[in-house]
Amino acid sequence: MPNIVEIAVSDERFSTLVTAVTAANLVDVLQSPGPFTVFAPTDTAFAKLPPGTITTLVQNIPQLARILTYHVVAGKFTQADLCRLSTVDSVEGSPIAIDCTEGFEVKNATVIIPDIEADNGIIHVIDNVILMG
């Protein structure tokens, strides 16, 4: 079974995410045994950010890494697991709010494809970049 990075690389919807993870030097971490739960924004999600945001972040690697690790949780959590929780702590350190009352919401994003199994965890595809704070 492919790992989280291999799944992202093989799916054209995640080209911006792959570029960002590579720029932030997080590829090795996300290829490690983990396990990890990744909330993966699509290219469409990144395109919703204000113009120039991605370029600015790629030039500020510590901030980019902080935002990306806010999308990662240590451990493997399925949709069913997450829906039993109200928050989950990100690798970045901040909590992420979970709401399953109307669909599957993760802070300001909706999970559009849950539970993509990877060798070292699980991916939930989201429609927005999760905003910190």
Curated annotation (Swiss-Prot):
PROSITE patterns: FAS1. SMART domains: FAS1 (SM00554). Gene3D superfamilies: FAS1 domain. Residues 1-130 form the FAS1 domain. It holds the Pfam family Fasciclin. This is Uncharacterized protein sll1735. It comes from Synechocystis sp. (strain ATCC 27184 / PCC 6803 / Kazusa).
